[in-house]
Amino acid sequence: MKRIVLAVLMLVAFFSCSNDVLQEEVLTRHEDGNKKEVRYYVKNEDGSKNYVRETWYYMEGMKHLDGPIIGGKRNGVFETYYKSGALMSKGTFIDGIREGEAFTYYENGNVKYQGFYVNGKECGIWKFYEENGELDKEVNRDLR
């Protein structure tokens, strides 16, 4: 938890101390030319790029994935979305590795499943739900 707070504080400090303008770099495009994968950056004094955010888009232009980058790696809360714009999943990365509680949702907003990651591995009790919100089952990922 301390690492998450530290990563968020570093990101806030970076943006508050920077006079640079956030710029967009389209890394990949869909076949129709629309943006697919975009990274946002500020330029360092030496002209190099310091990436601070990663966003992916569906072919139709709606956001699919979004989250912060620190030191070239995913750091902080990343979210994925359905084409409708509804939240699909939410989880934290530290130095590019999944860490902490993660949620996946049905398009209606109800939790589909939730669990914990430690050093990129599923651990503990994961809960799976029906689309109506009723608990379906619990699986102990430590016993696999």
What do the predicted segments below correspond to?
Residues 4-14:
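Sec-dependent N-terminal signal peptides
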Residues 17-81, 86-94, 98-105, 110-118, ...:
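Periodic aromatic/glycine/histidine/acidic cluster detector
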